[in-house]
Amino acid sequence: MPIGVPKVPFRIPGEEDAVWVDVYRLHRERLLFLGQGVDSEISNQLIGLMVYLSLEDETRDLFLFINSPGGWVVPGVAIYDTMQFVPPDVHTICMGLAASMGSFLLVGGEITKRIAFPHARVMIHQPASSFYEAQTGEFVLEAEELLKLRETLTRVYVQRTGNPLWVVSEDMERDVFMSATEAQAHGIVDFVAVENTGDFA
């Protein structure tokens, strides 16, 4: 079992020598990252961090950076429910791609605190399943569960985007890709981040 907290070298601009920074510093700054497909493992990690950080200080907001191609519905819904449950507001920031379950988590951020980077992409669609692997009886049960999940996701999109049910239902029939400004117009994000044109040299 390792002793101590793992550290990584980091060189501050303008400094000659690198300093050793512990890898959990970003978490202490309340910065969380979803940079992969949603599965049970990353879901449990993010849920644990959100609960721990909210118990530590329920007044400081959390920031969830999303760059995800999507993933499993149930672990994603668990993250969404936790975001609604914890007392701190959860800012969601889309960088790169927030597709499928990634866009669901993006829209789940505190309303007025959902941001997309200027070149980010967002994609929504209905949940999918591997019907071809199931036997007939299982197929029917799985189809019923899939319809319930689709209804849940649709209801959340309607509530959090302000779009009518028919618009969201129609959009979820197929893959709908959006730019950051289109996602803002659609109500998935509240703001598009402004590019920093400052000179860092």
UniProtKB/Swiss-Prot annotation:
Residue positions of the active site: 100 (nucleophile), 125
Transferase keyword on record: no
Any Pfam family hit: CLP_protease
PROSITE patterns: CLP_PROTEASE_HIS, CLP_PROTEASE_SER
Gene Ontology molecular functions: ATP-dependent peptidase activity; ATPase binding; serine-type endopeptidase activity
Disulfide bonds: none
Gene Ontology cellular component terms for the protein in this record: chloroplast stroma; endopeptidase Clp complex
Catalytic activity: Hydrolysis of proteins to small peptides in the presence of ATP and magnesium. alpha-casein is the usual test substrate. In the absence of ATP, only oligopeptides shorter than five residues are hydrolyzed (such as succinyl-Leu-Tyr-|-NHMec, and Leu-Tyr-Leu-|-Tyr-Trp, in which cleavage of the -Tyr-|-Leu- and -Tyr-|-Trp bonds also occurs)
Gene3D superfamilies linked: 2-enoyl-CoA Hydratase, Chain A, domain 1
Keywords: Chloroplast, Hydrolase, Plastid, Protease, Serine protease
Stored InterPro entries: ClpP, ClpP/crotonase-like_dom_sf, ClpP/TepA, ClpP_His_AS, ClpP_Ser_AS
EC number: 3.4.21.92
A Gene Ontology BP annotation from the UniProt entry: protein quality control for misfolded or incompletely synthesized proteins
Superkingdom of this protein's organism: Eukaryota
Enzyme class of the recorded protein, top EC level: hydrolase
Known function: Cleaves peptides in various proteins in a process that requires ATP hydrolysis. Has a chymotrypsin-like activity. Plays a major role in the degradation of misfolded proteins.
HAMAP family for this protein: ClpP
Family according to the record: Belongs to the peptidase S14 family.
PANTHER family reported for this sequence: ATP-DEPENDENT CLP PROTEASE PROTEOLYTIC SUBUNIT, CHLOROPLASTIC ATP-DEPENDENT CLP PROTEASE PROTEOLYTIC SUBUNIT 1
Protein name (database record): ATP-dependent Clp protease proteolytic subunit
Protein species of origin: Ranunculus macranthus (Large buttercup)
